[in-house]
Amino acid sequence: MDARWTNAQLLIKGIRSFSPENTNIIQFPKPLTLIVGRNGAGKTTIIECLKMGSTGELPPSARSGQAFIHDPKVADATEVKAQIKLRFRNVTGKPFVVIRSFQLTQKARGKLEKKDLDSVIQSTNDKGETVSVSKKCVDINAEVPSLMGVSKAILENVVFV
């Protein structure tokens, strides 16, 4: 069995400098993808979103997620909803979508409150129907690396160093 996930696509909405009003889709063509751009363009955010989508881990500088989600003050709103979707094919070629949804709310005296709204893995069954499994039914943070054919430790310490 070939331990590689392929045909990845990342959707980012409302994370750091990515606006909650726009959906940003990044394709990762085979065999190699280079992420280049000016300072502040979002290169690191793309890597952080890949890590969050695949392992559920926040970046170290995210302050419990409050600095990871687009700031409501910048959006001129009291709350911002954010989402990361990671589409990939597992080691056997079966397509999967991991969806992680968040909310950041501006409370009294400028305090920010982050909520994880949902985490879901979607796939298609033999009848072609979409099947969803939520974080309430399975440990998504362990399941996604398994579907990708690598351990969570490899993703965290080798791929997303």
Task: Identify the meaning behind each predicted range.
Residues 1-142, 146-152:
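Extreme N-terminal "head/tail" segments of very large remodeling/mechanoenzyme assemblies
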Residues 158-159:
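Conserved beta-strand/loop subsegment of P-loop NTPase cores
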